[in-house]
Amino acid sequence: MSLWFCPLTSTLSRQQPIHFIGVGGIGMSALALILVNRGHIVSGSDPRENTTVERLRAQGVRVFRDQSAANINAICSNVDLLPLVVISTAIPKSNPELKAAKLSQLKILHRSDLLAALIQAQPSIAVAGSHGKTTTSTLLTTLLATTDQDPTAVIGGVVPYYDSNGHAGKGRLLVAEADESDGSLVKFQATLGVITNLELDHTDHYADLDELINTMKRFGRGCRRLLANFDCPILKEHFDATAWWSVKTSAGVDFAALPICLNGDQTIADIYEQGKRMGQITLPMPGLHNLSNAMAAIAACRLAGLSFEDLQQGLADLQPPGRRFDFRGTWEGRQIVDDYAHHPSEVSATLAMARLIVTSGRSQLPSPPKRILAVFQPHRYSRTNEFLYEFARALGEADAVLLAPVYSAGENPIQGATSESLANAIRIQHPNLPVAVAENFNQLTLLVQKHSLKGDLVLAMGAGNINNLWRQLTRLDNAKTCPPSLAA
């Protein structure tokens, strides 16, 4: 059943210095961590000072605190080989460091080209999809690690098992998260490709769903074999996968996880392969979407030749990546959870999991919450504009909603794509649902203070800086004025 055949090779000399412009980004830092641990001289620049940058420095990466031409001069001195410069889509052509690298005639690679080289250099599994790819690749990495495979991992989130988003393993396998946001995943030629699901997103890059489908098809064709989600209508209609998985049926699929029990602290399911029951698993995570992510990870491991019995033993160690229903702490009787959900489908799935925790009375939180206060930060004007009414429908699953200003992610404003417009859409669709809009982040913390109740689950969602809400709550100043309470 094993797929793997290509020998482990290296496309880069270990003497090759590598410099990352924007090294603190989640995708860039993962590559930097792997390469520095493989013996390369690695440097980078990033104006942000955060735990990622601290981790890079601790591993031996030289990180400049600005992005200037002087950095290029510094890394080019006293080296036998000129540095290779790596950039991401987020780095504009006007970046002074990038301009200096071009003037110095340094070789410049997009991060996707570097990742593509790593993927092709050893047996690899690349995980793509609109939703769940970070969780799936994290669960896959963890299962491989707990079965003594020690994979190399390039993930778009922190893998709890390694407490890192990048790991230079000594095993034969590489796991990579394949981001579709800029279309660069078509460069990846993995031994096994995995597609978790597909629906329209990243409308700043894709004109329509057909363009996204065609891009993902190119990714699938570039992989030696393809594992896909049978429960996704778009994948089922448009893709010819080598193997399929489902959490709804065991008929006509290669792998299935059929739930027996779904509650707020775990999921129990029967596992099937080719229609044959293999055994039962207990997943220490709630939510049908997490069961699907776990089934994808298990299926990928089985295709890589691992035994089901070994995988069963590793399931107890599974944890989602950082910022996926991430319990941050308790504040004045409220439990604060942070989640990366920033698409209507993700918001809906996250709120469904929160509701399951409330209704079942079972949870891995310190105590079962009684009510859900959704604190949502829309991410990108283009996404807010495209999915305004879908976001309004999804947020209706909460008991009350607070909205932060749109996190631009570098985009220019679009008329009507505002948090106030979203609030109005919520009021139309859910007239009895309390909703309020914050003018800024400081007011948002005051709104949480005013509108939440003891026993609430304060669920912060978004891909911007909403993860700082917990820190802000612990530093609340006494406010003289605040809008009327939603909690009444």
From Swiss-Prot:
GO terms for molecular function: ATP binding; UDP-N-acetylmuramate-L-alanine ligase activity. It comes from the Bacteria. Keywords: ATP-binding, Cell cycle, Cell division, Cell shape, Cell wall biogenesis/degradation, Cytoplasm, Ligase, Nucleotide-binding, Peptidoglycan synthesis. Signal peptide: none annotated. One of its GO terms (biological process) is peptidoglycan biosynthetic process. The keyword Membrane does not apply. Pathway: Cell wall biogenesis; peptidoglycan biosynthesis. It is found in: Cytoplasm. It catalyses: UDP-N-acetyl-alpha-D-muramate + L-alanine + ATP = UDP-N-acetyl-alpha-D-muramoyl-L-alanine + ADP + phosphate + H(+). It is an enzyme of class 6 (ligase). The keyword Ligase applies. ATP binds at residues 129-135. Its EC number is 6.3.2.8. GO terms for cellular component: cytoplasm. Cell wall formation. Belongs to the MurCDEF family. This is UDP-N-acetylmuramate--L-alanine ligase. It comes from Prochlorococcus marinus (strain MIT 9303). The lineage of its organism: Bacteria, Bacillati, Cyanobacteriota, Cyanophyceae, Synechococcales.
